Amino acid sequence: MAGERKTGETNPDAAERVLAEYMARYPCGDAIRTVDRMCNLYSMTKSQAAIRELVKAMVDRTGNLPPLPAIFPNRMAPVVRDGAEGRELLMMRWGFPPPNIPGQKPRNPYLTNCRKTDSRYWQTYLKKPEHRCLVPVTSFAEPDNNQGPKSIWTWFARDESRPLMFFAGIWREWEGDRGTKAAPDVGTHLVFSFLTTDASPDVAPIHPDATPVLLLDEAAREQWMTAPWEEAALLRKPLPAGALKIVASGSKADEA
């Protein structure tokens, strides 16, 4: 999801040339090419008991989890992973750190989506089932093609009742500051991102660039969490037409 370019920002064509040169030298740099114009807003309004029941999570570390009608990058959100004590539900912060690019400040400090799964940066985690996770979601939002501050946000869910879905996610530990200049948050953080793929037929008329990889049934969830990467990678495909419905429009929160 890209905003309007402000005065003084780098010319996008020049920046693309610099990035292309960097990626030729440092292959992991391609991880940041597709972070813009993707899913950077979603909701999770079901109970933690509902999540645990679907994914058979035996451990719950979320405390008292409230409805989350608007989850933005760098916010805390519930995630399911396989831990030392079995499958667990816990809170993580949304967004991987970007690869370090010498002499260049990343355009986006948080990699919220993973599209180029052949990148060395992402392969470090994708190939290891212990670094894969399930991200509970009840709806997600995409902007229209305007892409500026006047963009209209459209919310997608399975139907009006917003049943649980899961993004195909990955997670890692990261040491650093995930706060603000006024309120630093320095320490060890658990962070997550999730996969995107080609826009599905339901999403493409609003947002043709991409759509999240969604896992709708137990077989798909278990394949993502346990299978070798060659098998898990088969899940990177858009849902068929009719799998998603538009359930809201205009607001940056899905309060239903």
Walk through the language-model features, giving the residues of each.
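Short linear sequence motif anchored by a di-proline
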Residues: 3-5, 15-256
